[in-house]
Amino acid sequence: MKKINKQALIDAVEQKQLKEYVPEFGAGDEVNVAIKLREKEKVRVQNFTGTVLRRRGRGISETFMVRKTTDGIPIEKNFQIHNPNIDIEVKRRGKVRRAYISYMRERSGKSAKIKEKKS
């Protein structure tokens, strides 16, 4: 009887759950995350547009953090990249030198702007 490698089995299951297409984005980019919410029979789409603070992890557990300010109140949300209930759309590319731009939390107004990356 052949012994099954646990990690190979885990990798096979995870591979099936990965999204086929994930847009290329990173810290500093402005993205729109469309969250599909199910309310009984109805499916509603809620948009969350903001700046990506970081992207971390690998495989099925890969996540990214988005920050937006609404009426002067900052909101940060973590999303799973391979979540089937979200769609990610890159609005504009930002030019930053860090993988995690935590310094954006202290900034407001004009100093919180990120330059656009020239393509």
From Swiss-Prot:
Keyword ATP-binding among record annotations: no
Domain of life, source organism: Bacteria
GO cellular component, one term: cytosolic large ribosomal subunit
Keywords: Ribonucleoprotein, Ribosomal protein
Gene Ontology process terms (BP): translation
Keyword Ribonucleoprotein: yes
A molecular-function term among this protein's GO annotations: structural constituent of ribosome
Disulfide bonds: none
Gene3D superfamilies tied to this protein: 2.30.30.790
HAMAP family assigned: Ribosomal_bL19
Function, as annotated: This protein is located at the 30S-50S ribosomal subunit interface and may play a role in the structure and function of the aminoacyl-tRNA binding site.
Family: Belongs to the bacterial ribosomal protein bL19 family.
Name the UniProt record assigns to this protein: Large ribosomal subunit protein bL19
UniProt gene name: rplS
